[in-house]
Amino acid sequence: MKEFMYYVNGLYFANLKTARKHAQRVGDSDILLTLGDYDETILSYNPMSERLERQMSVNEAKEKLLQEYESKRFIK
């Protein structure tokens, strides 16, 4: 049976509290709710902006985060 996991910057966490602490420690990072490792991502949540979005997959969510990071990096 697969269990829900929380993905933040390459790491998986079993509970939201730990994932949120890590996301806040590393900066403005999304928390992805997944069903098992590298499976379908259900939701992504940004603790800083409190934005919640439905995602299609972990890879799609990672790609979106990388694009956001790149766009922020070039703006500065």
Where are these regions (language model features)?
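Short linear sequence elements within intrinsically disordered, low-complexity coil regions
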Residues: 9-12, 17-18, 27, 50, ...
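Acidic/polar low-complexity segments and flexible, solvent-exposed patches
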Residues: 38-74
